[in-house]
């Protein structure tokens, strides 16, 4: 039976037997590769649009043809089943095409943050046994070019495919882009630099494979299809492998749910593909639903709403800051949102008042939806829990998507808690995460009533309706406005490595300009700092202990600094983090203004306070 017809049958079966929904879905998980799944979902709408970039649009028929052409290209490169190909790419049509092309031939796409530093790049390429690299031209210059000797001599990687924005643009638009931005042909410039490394561009990649015979990898149960990454407890992104079932299951859950996507035709794809929420929850879900994905390779928090209004995309998955920016600027007072059919946020929280204000704005500006929230984990390939904004209890993040099941556990007794009691969320899905990879145990599971559950590390409670309420993260990590996770202990250790620092505390504050959390630091200076300008000290710490730290990102930079004589402590002689969080900011702080986009940090400014107490240095 055709997949989409079977999905409709299962929806009716679940409606008639809601208490058995988990087992019904568990016994009917689609058996396709990622490539096979989107091909099956779209075989009857090949004339509909699949991708858009600038003025260039591709139908699903053209999209699948391109996947097949690129698959031939990788076969001609010598890429085989099981090979791992590192992708260092922003959201471009080529990025999506390449992912499915690799999946078609049974190779594994290893999606790495293109802003990763040199040492972290080496770490990923070696640890994850990469066989070849595909990277954006700008990323080649910043991250790959300097380690060419290493990747060939140490890792035996001898193939690098380079993509460019102009590869995706129509001829005239491509020429205009080259004129405006002085686009250089990196492929020509480096192709003979290292005789042992084959560096080439898309045109040669496709031309050299015109007569290549391509093998389509058949579906094999529990075969790893892709690798993404997420920050671990040390702040170092950890490897998250996913099977075809893991990736397809997210789309399957949405398709089998009661969410109506029939009016959604276009999806603004801004969440990055190296993260599961951009890969499974956005890219693969969108194509499984037959939507036109509008690819946005580079954006900033300041222009994301402008992009939404310009493209008139029907659907946007984003962070809370996107939507707070919409209601926080007078420039959008007259915005017409009549095109918006689905709006979703994750990676952070909104207060009940903030959510009400956003929904009031959406309704008054003609949007066809309310803002929907949910909860998920990268380890589960994204969303696990999703709300119906028209029916949910205020403050809830929703109920289980079909095929998911969560229970609240007391971590001390390991007993399930009653409704309304706080505990650790343990979660299970019809397609659970890969628990062991390359000989390493990634997750420990516990068996409860015949199902395997994983500790999410998040504190929640659940009501009698099955709705979940997120209360915090057990690890105490800070979730920035853009969803990036900061680990206070790791950041404190980095800053206190400076001889100018005696002690520090890291907390968070609400950043009104970004509509979300940002890191706040309390600093006690050491004797070595005497006589040195405070701006020089801060610059030294940022440059030498954060930006130069291989386990940190520019996103770890505290944007508010308080220099104090002593840190607050509780009566139990423990640092009082609760107090500094409650105190927040008062204008006496030194501000770090970071000029950043999703592709990296351009520069930062140190701004001294204009009011408050005079800073005292030891």
How would you describe each model-predicted region?
Residues 53-58, 71-119, 270-272:
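Conserved AMP-binding/adenylate-forming
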Residues 59-61, 216, 225-249:
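Conserved AMP-binding A3 loop
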Residues 104-203:
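Structural core segment of the AMP-binding/adenylate-forming
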Residues 116, 124, 135-138, 316, ...:
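AMP-binding/adenylate-forming catalytic core of the ANL superfamily
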Residues 175-179, 189-190, 194, 313-317, ...:
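Gly/Ser/Thr-rich phosphate-binding loop
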Residues 248-266, 274-315, 329:
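Conserved AMP-binding/adenylation subdomain of ANL enzymes
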Residues 399-403, 415-446, 451, 467, ...:
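Conserved ATP/PPi-binding loop(s) of AMP-dependent carboxylate-activating enzymes
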Residues 505-510, 520-522, 543-618:
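Conserved C-terminal "lid"/linker of ANL adenylate-forming enzymes
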